[in-house]
Amino acid sequence: KTFSFNAFFNTKNFAINILSTNQADIAIRFASSATNKFQNIDFIENSSNTPLISNVLSSIECENYKCIECGDHYIFIGKVLKVQINSEVSIKDPLIYYGKSYRELK
């Protein structure tokens, strides 16, 4: 199992952070096998103690509801506890990963 799998499997809550098109570097970091993914990232404190990244389009706080084994992968299902939309970010376009590259919606 990977570092990321163990982090998700052993936690009560997790967060989904919706990045904007100028934040591909964060997506690349968290998609890597590095174990220091959270180093030098600014976070927002919150009641569920989940890693909400500062200056993202939106953050979704989830309870770790279920983990389903699917072949050699696992699917984590979260029960949404809270959604935050950041109206103060300057770039409003979400970062999309499609066709092995990062893109923006047009």
Feature locations, PLM:
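Basic, polyanion-binding surface patches
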Residues: 1-106
